[in-house]
């Protein structure tokens, strides 16, 4: 263990000092070591620093706990990444409230060329799980050099990790507790596999419980580490939306998949898109093009893209088949005749298909297939 690791870990144990204040101190003074070594001169080095903060730095208990944690880390192949460490995530370091210490167990480079965060509801539907799987599979075909970040939670998070491993993407799980446990325990097997192609990351020392407030802190790391955050499926309220909001505040790109307007677990995504807080994507090619990333091959059209929307009704499939044969598009009255669907039903079906990103309403009341 190094002096900087000890001092930085100790800083996180000082009561009453938040991440923004800690980041600001390190940026102005240079390092955690310098903060303690020049404690008596801090008021001159950092204008506005309070006497209360300076006094709080005299905390032997913090050093004792820091040394215990670093011994635990060394015994368990855990890296302690301080704020100025070359292996600390560069994208995260740019955030005002970045953690000054991260504990990491894994084998992948956290400063990969391309990093995305995939998040969503814990109560994922078959639609959301299929979306997540299809997106990552398509990404593997056109842009395989990506690090995938998520939170190891139930639902979309664990689906993202497992599918990433399936298609040989490195994937990192950001935890809301220490590295002495895996929560939820049902994901232990996946977490172990991730340490061979990715890893587990946290700002919390061992012994920290996965308390509610820690998940919000965890979400800022998920948002801060990435180039872009992708919300696959979310209710009107939830952690995925918090992550999306944080990503926006960090000036990250944010994307969301649309869903049916009446579906509870698509309400959050639809709201993000409606309020221009996330860009609508239908597939991996949409995403890669929006990011301006080079990609190897064109994603297959037609059936492959349509797999992102597996829950099509018989009427929706019929409309798609008709529009495939009429590439210039068709007016609603012509679709009613061709599909033998009453106009009272046709309007609602076309709206659902447009929300899914399958068709688009053009000038003159013409509907055209986008796939």
Language-model-derived ranges and their functions:
Residues 1-142:
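Short, positively charged patches
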Residues 2, 82-371:
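Glycine-biased, small-residue-rich flexible motifs in mid-sequence functional cores and linkers
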């Amino acid at each position: 263990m190094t002096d900087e690791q000890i001092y930085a870990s100790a800083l996180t144990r000082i009561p009453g000092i938040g991440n923004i204040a800690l980041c600001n101190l390190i940026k102005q003074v240079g390092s955690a070591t310098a903060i303690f070594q020049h404690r008596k001169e801090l008021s001159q080095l950092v204008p506005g620093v309070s006497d209360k903060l300076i006094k709080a730095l005299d905390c032997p208990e913090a050093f004792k706990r820091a040394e215990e944690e670093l011994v635990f880390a060394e015994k368990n192949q855990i890296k302690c990444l301080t704020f100025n460490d070359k292996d600390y995530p560069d994208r995260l370091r740019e955030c005002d409230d970045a953690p000054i210490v991260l504990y990491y167990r894994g084998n992948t480079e956290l400063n990969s060329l391309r990093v995305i965060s995939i998040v969503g509801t814990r109560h994922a539907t078959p639609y959301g799980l299929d979306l997540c799987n299809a997106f990552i599979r398509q990404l593997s075909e056109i842009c395989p050099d990506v690090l995938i970040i998520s939170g190891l939670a139930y639902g979309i998070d664990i689906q993202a990790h497992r599918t990433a491993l399936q298609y040989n993407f490195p994937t990192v799980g950001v935890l809301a507790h220490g590295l002495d446990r895996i929560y939820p325990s049902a994901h232990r097997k996946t977490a172990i596999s991730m340490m061979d192609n990715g890893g587990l990351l946290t700002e919390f020392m061992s012994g920290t419980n996965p308390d509610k407030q820690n998940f919000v802190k965890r979400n800022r790391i998920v948002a801060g580490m990435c180039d872009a955050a992708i919300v696959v499926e979310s209710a009107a309220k939830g952690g995925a939306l918090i992550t999306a909001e944080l990503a926006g505040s960090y000036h990250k790109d944010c994307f969301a998949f649309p869903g049916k307007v009446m579906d509870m677990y698509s309400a959050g995504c639809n709201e993000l898109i409606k309020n221009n807080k996330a860009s609508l994507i239908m597939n991996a090619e949409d995403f890669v093009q929006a990011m301006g990333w080079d990609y190897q091959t064109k994603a297959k059209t037609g059936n492959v893209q349509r797999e992102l929307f597996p829950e099509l009704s018989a009427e929706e499939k019929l409309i798609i088949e008709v529009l495939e044969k009429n590439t210039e598009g068709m007016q609603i009255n012509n679709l009613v005749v061709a599909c033998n669907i009453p106009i009272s039903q046709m309007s609602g079906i076309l709206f659902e298909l447009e929300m899914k990103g399958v068709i688009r309403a053009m000038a003159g009341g013409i509907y055209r297939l986008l796939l």
